[in-house]
Amino acid sequence: MKKRITFIVFLCAIVAASLFFVQSCVRKSQHVAGFQNYQATIDGKEITGVTKNISSLTWSAQSNTLFSTINKPATIVEMTTEGDLIRTIPLDFVKDLETIEYIGDNKFVISDERDYAIYVISLNADSEVSILKKIKIPLQETPTNCGFEGLAYSSQDHTFWFFKEKNPIEVYKVTGLLRSDELHISKDKTLQRQFTLDDVSGAEFNPQKNTLLVLSHESRALQEVTVRGDVIGEMSLTKGKYGLSHNIKQAEGIAMDDSGNIYIVGEPNLFYRFTSTKSR
């Protein structure tokens, strides 16, 4: 009798393990399917005029150009969607520039990883920068190199998501930043507890699907997640996947344009573009 019970328990364990394996495979298959139509059409192009420290990326619908940052010395970089440099704009009020997000009408939100400061700025065609607003999100008393690395913005409801890189990954949801009052900052614990990535190095909001694109250079992956944190797509950033000839070693910024093209920048100065064979 005892042997029979042991056998039944053993059999149940095998069935449970098999079900878990099948479900895991199904989830992975579904995740891959989210990006299955994408291929690299620009594969690790060096950005001429930038030598190192490229970090973060955003697309401007106003100019149909991309804006990136160099963290040290703090500099905003504008380039074409082909990865060609247009101009550089030095900033003298930021210590460690890490994120940039276009919010419309020549305005951007940037963050300083060194002191957790967030700026709303305007940038005109003459490369003149004006600070419109500054706030701080106190992550911890002693600044580290694990501050904000990802920033996503929904123009639909003017919500920002600021992603702390790691140790641990944290997500701060900010509303009211673009108004003169009603500023609200909260930890998005529902979103952050779902992450399986080793770190967050960049982020982007996809208004077409109301989802977030979250980049990880340590995991060498790009995930698409719902605002509740459910993973619905994953792209491997390794050699042989999605037309890549080499691993993207240190992916630092992610942007998407209104045609669904995905742009990634990686240190020291590399540019990637992924294009879908059909609209998403």
From Swiss-Prot:
Main location: membrane
Organism encoding this protein: Escherichia coli O157:H7
Domain of life of the source: Bacteria
UniProt record similarity statement: Belongs to the YjiK family.
Keywords: Cell membrane, Membrane, Transmembrane, Transmembrane helix
UniProt keyword Transmembrane, yes or no: yes
Entry protein name: Uncharacterized protein YjiK
Residue ranges crossing the lipid bilayer per the database entry: 5-25
Subcellular location: Cell membrane
Pfam families: SdiA-regulated (PF06977)
Membrane topology: Single-pass membrane protein
GO CC terms: plasma membrane
